[in-house]
Amino acid sequence: MATAVGMNIQLLLEAADYLERREREAEHGYASMLPYSKDRDAFKRRNKPKKNSTSSRSTHNEMEKNRRAHLRLCLEKLKGLVPLGPESSRHTTLSLLTKAKLHIKKLEDCDRKAVHQIDQLQREQRHLKRRLEKLGAERTRMDSVGSVVSSERSDSDREELDVDVDVDVDVDVEGTDYLNGDLGWSSSVSDSDERGSMQSLGSDEGYSSATVKRAKLQDGHKAGLGL
């Protein structure tokens, strides 16, 4: 009787201690597990159902078989990803994993080199872009200077062309006067030549008609004489 009362008092003390801890933990914002109790542990062991050892063993065997099948599938996939060489069928699991580890390191090195090369190319691209912008600004400035020079040159060429046209007009006028004089002299000479030709032609025609008349008179005289 005294023993039972003592156990009940001990349980009450543990419960009170637990409640105080929970209140303190609630104030500080964290919680803890229940204090260990032999009676509660014994109660759980008594109420724990007994499992069948045969069914547990079969379940374990089935899980192990599935795990091995999954492992074989993963190893086959790994063989397709890792370069193994001509004797790939003779490789053990350990050698396959070793080669896979080396291949992963090689890929990581290639990845680091690629990242470094990309950074270098990006820096070069930025440098070329700045240089292109600078050249574009210089080209715009040169185009503006060239347009100013071209406009000035066109103005000077236009002035020189006006001067040349004035000189050519003066020369052409003088040449026309000289040509008119030549044409007048040649026309007078041609007129005199034409008049001389007409006179000579008329004299020739008169001479010819007189000769014909004289021949006809001689023929008539001979006929009258009976010759």
Swiss-Prot record:
Keywords: DNA-binding, Nucleus, Repressor, Transcription, Transcription regulation, Ubl conjugation. The keyword Magnesium does not apply. Residues 55-107 form the bHLH domain. It comes from the Eukaryota. Residues 30-66, 142-161, 184-227 are annotated as: Disordered. It is found in: Nucleus. GO terms for cellular component: Mad-Max complex. Gene3D superfamilies: Helix-loop-helix DNA-binding domain. Heterodimer with MAX; the interaction is required for DNA-binding. DNA binding requires dimerization with another bHLH protein; does not form homodimers, and does not bind to DNA in the absence of MAX in vitro. Interacts with RNF17. This is Max dimerization protein 1.
